[in-house]
A protein has these predicted regions:
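The feature marks the mature, well-folded catalytic cores of soluble enzymes
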Residues: 1-178
Length: 178
């Protein structure tokens, strides 16, 4: 649901009903709040990601990131981790180890917006060899049987989208001959 300017007439009750009906799930966990530094305005793929059936990775602010520990954003991420853990899942925290400046914008190096494919994971890169390498190593530990690739996506990230955003929900359509 995220940003209040989206899905104006769609509430949690309807969302939970639809998720259970159309996806056959039994439990829905709602995460509250939109981090100020979240360019996607509350998309879950920048906050928490499943890596196994019972394990969820949740982002964590650090003293090197724009979202500082004990900030509003940190409290949103910490609360998300708590809610997910209380729902019975294992939680791993994914540190935001820095930030970048690109086209007069500053944003955190949040590597959560990855794509998982058959035998591979592609994660956004931020052109910082140190944080990109550390993130790659962590993501490899989350997905030990997959090849992990970090791809620099600064212009895309600055526009509010990452790897998962660009590859999710590809519509099926047929080309019409003219």
């Amino acid at each position: 649901l995220g940003d209040p300017s989206r899905n104006i007439n769609y509430d949690k009750i309807q969302a939970e009903h639809d998720l259970k009906k159309y996806f056959g799930i039994s439990k829905v966990i709602f995460i509250e709040g939109i981090p100020d530094g979240d360019l996607t305005k509350g998309h879950i793929d920048g906050i928490a990601r499943f890596i196994e059936t019972r394990t969820v990775v949740v982002v964590q602010c650090t003293s090197n990131s724009l979202c500082q520990p004990n900030s509003k954003d940190a409290k949103i991420y910490d609360n998300a981790a708590k809610i997910i853990e209380e729902a019975g899942f294992n939680v791993i925290r994914e540190p935001i180890e820095g930030f970048v400046q690109y086209n007069n914008q500053k944003f955190d190096t949040n590597y959560m917006n990855w794509l998982v494919g058959n035998g591979f994971v592609i994660a956004p890169g931020f052109g910082n060899s140190i944080t990109d390498a550390k993130a790659k190593s962590r993501i490899e530990s989350y997905f030990p049987n997959r090849d992990v690739h970090i791809i620099e996506m600064l212009s895309s990230w600055a526009a509010g989208g990452g790897v998962h955003c660009h590859t999710n929900d590809q519509p099926a359509f047929s080309l019409q001959q003219g």
